[in-house]
Amino acid sequence: MLIVLSPAKSLDYETPARTKTHTLPRFIERSAVLIDRLRKLAPQDVGALMDISDKLAVLNVTRYAEWSETFTAANSKQAVLAFNGDVYDGFDAKSLSADDLGFAQKHVRILSGLYGVLRPMDWMQPYRLEMGTRLDNAAGKDLYAFWGDDVTRLLNDDMAGLKHEGAPTLVNLASEEYFKVVRPKVLNARIITPVFEDWKGGRYKIISFHAKRARGTMARYAVTHRVTEPAALKRFAEDGYAFDAAASNDGRWVFRRRLED
């Protein structure tokens, strides 16, 4: 069983990494192609392309200029410790043990516009490039065209390494924008997408902030409980959520909570 997460826009490169243990991204040469493309853009182009402020555009133009194919402790940080958003608040990697991080390294993947697929302990240089960005490139009009089947094939390889755990299953805890880079026809696995709904205004609905955090919390649950069979995820009951069999189907598992009446 392999879990996929989305990355975060917010990054933390100020807090020192709590471990020196690391691996390297597996698509560095492909990332370098994207960086070369991004370096051709002026700050105003980056701002328009990504719909971000002038200040953020300048910051990211600087990041692209400083990005190097040589990853070091000075310019990089482990992905799961560098990402800093709702999902990663739920995952809370900084409080995981070394054994937990070792399990995550085998069972959790982070989809990325620049890096394709990251393992938790992969060194990562700071960047901003969302998967949905319409950055034209030699392969097509956007990053889905750029990555093609590559991301899916690497996920297949990673799941093949877990075949002793049972039938290959990909647990989709990523956003729709990011999971679109995974091609179901190429994927050699069953897909399960957990959905988190909260009671509000007289009905259950997905509330983005809560859903993002819950995705990270479920990934953490899978790591700390050493979950290798998808069925065990149905026992997830963190933060008041509970599996709702009646609202679920084979590929869409609904977890609901009711904090207000």
Curated annotation (Swiss-Prot):
One of its GO terms (cellular component) is cytosol. One of its GO terms (biological process) is response to hydroperoxide. InterPro entries: YaaA. Pfam families: H2O2_YaaD (PF03883). Belongs to the UPF0246 family. This is UPF0246 protein Reut_A1014. The lineage of its organism: Bacteria, Pseudomonadati, Pseudomonadota, Betaproteobacteria, Burkholderiales.
